[in-house]
């Protein structure tokens, strides 16, 4: 007899009613009495468990009643309807074999565990209800991202994880070396001699795939990357991780408004896809993690995102009467408290803030005609703040070179990026979406460590 997934039993219950099935999975609970026992089994294919009825006539009944939680089993039995119970059916077992007995010190017993505790056992937390839901949603959301871009003709491209350039110009990169740290070769000037290193020059883990993606956009028109990025930023907050995943589309012949349209449609698409394909998980989040989750997500997918300039945002915040820890003035980068005030108190929906001061944005963003601002835009959402950052890219070689000089960037490190402007350059735009940020928004989880399988943060690279 073939194995039937528990997901199939729930999705096509009538098809299996009164029929014999075989399942396998892990024991979640055991409740026994003298003549029968109830065992809940989860096979990993579905958020919900299936209840198995054990009768004392089973030859190994006594052994089964003593199964520790997380014991793996194979079950054969008849599907029976349970019209007056919480679950729509149960399995009356005809045979149960123990595949692998769990130790009695299994840490995930039948009680609620804090997310903080579960982070200390990241190798086991996918077995808990909360993280089973989180990581299934993560999988669905990742698929939805690919589905959105593929259906619109975007080419998926892989950009390098090891790079010699700093896309953001912030210098917060993890440096790579194979040199003996106790005997580092030096030049005559006493500096590190990177010519003796593995790549023959300084190398780092990428902070963004954007610059590489731009090269493909100027060949394929519309492309996107979706991969890991790394920031050596010593920020020990609930919103920052040292390793995270980024979605980075780049579109040729596209202005800033084209990026805004694409990003708005993409966010709505991903949310809708998860809501439709993970109803049980989303109901769990709405009940136990964030009781206002459904209302918030419904507001996002059914509203037109507001679009205002940075200057307008500053003026609104200054006139609002709101009390902030960080003073609002033109030229500062908006803090999370400012972003949330705009989305939660003033507009009560997602907001694109555009045309930021050039001095707080990256070198590759297109300079506006005023000479003070750039064609950049961030998407701010209620409950989180910024989840997307992007811009129209600077296609004018002379303007780009001048901007790099202002920031003391070595043009030789970016020779290939500058050369793109020589061979049929065109206006183009793109953006970056931190995948974990949108997962936090969709699930209601408030800490980035709880939406990534094995979080990497300052002082912690366990598992």
UniProtKB/Swiss-Prot annotation:
Subunit comment: Homodimer.
Keyword Nuclease assigned: no
Main location (coarse class): cytoplasm
Record-given protein name: Asparagine--tRNA ligase
Enzyme class (EC, first level): ligase
SUPFAM superfamilies recorded: Class II aaRS and biotin synthetases, Nucleic acid-binding proteins
An example Gene Ontology CC term for this record: cytoplasm
Family: Belongs to the class-II aminoacyl-tRNA synthetase family.
Gene name of the record: asnS
E.C. numbers: 6.1.1.22
Keywords: Aminoacyl-tRNA synthetase, ATP-binding, Cytoplasm, Ligase, Nucleotide-binding, Protein biosynthesis
